[in-house]
């Protein structure tokens, strides 16, 4: 199994966790499921996902709290929000707070898989870009007294 296809699912609804876990595993993803945001945060000390799919409204630490944690500490990990509360204000709030995408419940499993796949592809491209930028910067030498740069 590719380590770059690690998806974490956080939802307080057991049936949603079951459907997503089964569907995503069948689609070739490595999946971990969590009942709430506290479980996700506790697991971050041990491992990290390549993408987080989280319910917006959960008891305890909810999806917006997780989004804030990921935005501040793991900004390279895409967060996809899920909710049955698909009003425009909620959607705008999620995007303004750094959500990569948004899935309204009830959802189509193929749509969820497509959004996760796109998030993983974009993450991979951003990582490649960052590596190339670092490589280019390592080739540049800046002379401190003159501030001239050479390659």
Predicted regions located by residue number:
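Short amphipathic alpha-helix used as the core "switch/output" element in two-component signaling
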Residues: 39-42, 64-75
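Single conserved hydrophobic/aromatic residue that forms the stacking wall/gate
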Residues: 140-151
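Charged docking surfaces used in two-component/phosphorelay signaling
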Residues: 18-26
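The feature encodes the CheY-like receiver
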Residues: 17, 59, 83, 87
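Acidic catalytic/metal-coordinating carboxylates
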Residues: 5, 35-36, 62-65
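Short hydrophobic/Thr-rich beta-strand motif most characteristic of the beta2 strand and flanking loop
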Residues: 28-35, 43
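Active-site residues of response regulator receiver
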Residues: 11, 55, 83
